[in-house]
C-alpha cells in the first residue's frame, strides 16, 4: 500500500523544482488519489553565491538542510541531482532510487563558435574543476572563469561577463527546455562527466518501508549500477566537488564499463583508465578503478590539490 500523503523536500531553484515536480507527477500517475506536497527548503549552497563551491565545502552544501528536515520528520523524501549528493549519508538516511539517466554530456554554449574554433586565450565560464582540468588539458591557452548561480544566470553570464563560452550539464538544460542555446554537446570521451551527472537520486529514511516501496518503480537498474560504480570511485578517492575527478559508467547487457579520470586543476597532470565487469560488481569495479588511478599517479595529484587548498 502506497502512503496516502508524501512530502518532497526540495530546493527552490528552477531545476530542483522541475525535478521535484517530475517525481510528484510520476507518483500521482502511479498512485491515483495520493497527495504529494512540495516543501521548499533553502540550503547553504543557495545562500552563498559569490564564492566558488570548492572554497565553501563542496558537495554537501545543497543537501544538508534537506536531510536535517527529513530526520526531523518534516518531509518524507528528497529528490537530488546525483552529482550533488555526497558519498556518505547521515545515519538513518539513504539513497533508495536512482532514476533513468538523462543526457550525461556537458553542453558547450557560445555565440555560434564550436570548442575547436575558440580563439586563442578564450574565456570559458564553468563552476566545475573537472571541466576546467579537461578543457585546459586540450587547450592550455584558455582562461577559466568560475561562474555560479542557476542555469539561466549562467547562460546570461555569457554576454554579461564577456565570456566566449559557458559549459553546463546538458541534462539540466534539457529538463528546463533550454536546448536551443546549446552550440554543441561535448563527447563523454573528451569531457568525462561528473559522478552521477544526468541521473536523479531519491533519498528517504531507511526505516520508512512504505515510502521506499512506493518509490521503487522509479529505480532504473542500469543507471543505478553505473552511478554506484562512479560513486564508489569517488568515495575511494575521497573527492568532493572541489577535486578534479570525473567518472562515467555505461551498461550494455550485464556488462558495466567505467572510465575514470583524476587531474590537477590546470590539466597538466592527468591519469585516466577504464575497467569492465559485471553490473552486479558495480561498487567493486569503482573501487578497483580508483585504486588503479591512485597508484598510477592520482594519489600524488590529489595530495597536491589538497595541499594547495590548505595553503589558501
UniProtKB/Swiss-Prot annotation:
Pathway: Porphyrin-containing compound metabolism; protoporphyrin-IX biosynthesis; coproporphyrinogen-III from 5-aminolevulinate: step 2/4. It catalyses: 4 porphobilinogen + H2O = hydroxymethylbilane + 4 NH4(+). Its cofactor is dipyrromethane. One of its GO terms (biological process) is protoporphyrinogen IX biosynthetic process. Binds 1 dipyrromethane group covalently. Pfam families: Porphobil_deam, Porphobil_deamC. Its EC number is 2.5.1.61. It is an enzyme of class 2 (transferase). GO terms for molecular function: hydroxymethylbilane synthase activity. SUPFAM superfamilies: Periplasmic binding protein-like II, Porphobilinogen deaminase (hydroxymethylbilane synthase), C-terminal domain. Keywords: Porphyrin biosynthesis, Transferase. GO terms for cellular component: cytoplasm. CDD domains: PBP2_EcHMBS_like. The modification S-(dipyrrolylmethanemethyl)cysteine is found at residue 241. It comes from the Bacteria. Tetrapolymerization of the monopyrrole PBG into the hydroxymethylbilane pre-uroporphyrinogen in several discrete steps. The porphobilinogen subunits are added to the dipyrromethane group. Monomer. Belongs to the HMBS family. This is Porphobilinogen deaminase. It comes from Trichlorobacter lovleyi (strain ATCC BAA-1151 / DSM 17278 / SZ) (Geobacter lovleyi). The lineage of its organism: Bacteria, Pseudomonadati, Thermodesulfobacteriota, Desulfuromonadia, Geobacterales. The gene is hemC.
Amino acid at each position: 500500500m502506497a502512503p496516502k500523503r508524501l512530502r518532497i523536500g526540495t530546493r527552490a531553484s528552477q531545476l530542483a523544482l522541475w525535478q521535484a515536480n517530475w517525481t510528484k507527477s510520476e507518483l500521482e500517475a502511479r498512485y491515483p488519489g495520493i497527495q504529494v506536497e512540495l516543501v521548499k527548503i533553502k540550503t547553504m549552497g543557495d545562500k552563498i553565491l559569490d564564492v566558488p563551491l570548492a572554497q565553501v565545502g563542496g558537495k554537501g552544501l545543497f543537501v544538508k538542510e534537506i536531510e536535517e528536515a527529513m530526520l526531523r520528520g518534516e518531509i518524507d523524501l528528497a529528490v537530488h541531482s546525483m552529482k550533488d549528493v555526497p558519498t556518505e549519508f547521515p545515519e538513518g538516511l539513504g539513497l533508495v532510487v536512482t532514476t533513468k539517466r538523462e543526457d550525461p554530456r556537458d553542453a558547450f554554449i557560445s555565440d555560434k563558435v564550436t570548442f575547436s574554433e575558440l580563439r586563442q586565450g578564450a574565456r570559458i565560464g564553468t563552476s566545475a574543476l573537472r571541466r576546467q582540468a579537461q578543457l585546459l588539458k586540450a587547450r592550455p591557452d584558455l582562461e577559466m572563469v568560475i561562474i555560479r548561480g542557476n542555469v539561466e544566470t549562467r547562460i546570461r553570464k555569457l554576454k554579461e561577463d564577456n565570456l566566449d563560452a559557458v559549459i553546463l550539464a546538458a541534462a539540466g538544460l534539457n529538463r528546463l527546455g533550454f536546448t536551443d542555446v546549446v552550440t554543441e554537446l561535448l563527447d563523454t570521451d573528451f569531457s568525462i562527466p561528473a559522478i552521477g551527472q544526468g541521473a536523479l537520486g531519491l533519498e528517504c529514511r531507511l526505516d520508512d518501508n512504505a515510502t521506499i516501496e512506493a518509490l521503487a518503480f522509479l529505480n532504473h537498474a542500469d543507471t543505478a549500477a553505473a552511478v554506484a560504480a562512479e560513486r564508489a570511485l569517488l568515495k575511494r578517492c575521497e573527492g568532493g566537488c572541489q577535486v578534479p575527478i570525473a567518472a562515467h559508467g555505461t551498461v550494455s547487457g550485464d556488462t558495466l564499463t567505467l572510465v575514470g579520470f583524476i587531474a590537477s586543476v590546470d590539466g597538466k597532470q592527468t591519469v585516466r583508465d577504464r575497467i569492465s565487469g559485471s553490473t552486479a560488481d558495480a561498487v567493486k569495479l569503482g573501487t578497483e578503478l580508483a585504486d588503479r588511478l591512485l597508484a598510477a599517479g592520482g594519489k600524488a595529484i590529489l595530495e597536491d590539490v589538497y595541499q594547495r587548498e590548505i595553503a589558501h
